[in-house]
């Protein structure tokens, strides 16, 4: 299980990302529409003004049950070893083990 402080930090980043999403998107759109380089640099400065944790690349998907940030399957929201355990226990409908 991940530390609660890490899970809380991730939730805080998600809130920040949602808060500054429109500002980032509008600034990027302005940069693509303006031809002059000097104005692009000014808008780029505005793009750097939001907090660093509000960037979408700072977010991690975490396992629903353990909070593990790596080896997550998007379809299930689970990490690999938890997914394997649940499939073996027949807790995920429609998921089967491969055999050939």
UniProtKB/Swiss-Prot annotation:
Source organism (scientific name): Draba nemorosa
A Pfam family per the record: Ribosomal_S14
Matches recorded under NCBIfam families: PRK08881.1 (NF006477)
HAMAP family: Ribosomal_uS14_1
Assembly mode: Part of the 30S ribosomal subunit.
Protein's name in the database: Small ribosomal subunit protein uS14c
Chief site of localization: plastid
Taxonomic classification: Eukaryota, Viridiplantae, Streptophyta, Embryophyta, Tracheophyta
Biological role stated in the UniProt entry: Binds 16S rRNA, required for the assembly of 30S particles.
Keywords carried by this UniProt record: Chloroplast, Plastid, Ribonucleoprotein, Ribosomal protein, RNA-binding, rRNA-binding
One GO MF term attached to the UniProt entry: structural constituent of ribosome
Similarity field: Belongs to the universal ribosomal protein uS14 family.
UniProt subcellular location: Plastid, Chloroplast
InterPro entries listed in its UniProt record: Ribosomal_uS14, Ribosomal_uS14_bac/plastid, Ribosomal_uS14_CS
């Amino acid at each position: 299980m991940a530390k609660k402080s890490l899970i809380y930090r991730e939730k805080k980043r998600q809130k920040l990302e949602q808060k500054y999403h429109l500002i980032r998107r509008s600034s990027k759109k302005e940069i693509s529409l303006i031809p002059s380089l000097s104005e692009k640099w000014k808008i780029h400065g505005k793009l750097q003004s939001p907090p660093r944790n509000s960037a979408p690349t700072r977010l991690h998907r975490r396992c629903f049950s353990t909070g593990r940030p790596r080896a997550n399957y998007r379809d299930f929201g689970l990490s690999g070893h938890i997914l394997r355990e649940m499939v073996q226990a027949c807790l995920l409908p429609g998921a089967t083990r491969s055999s050939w």
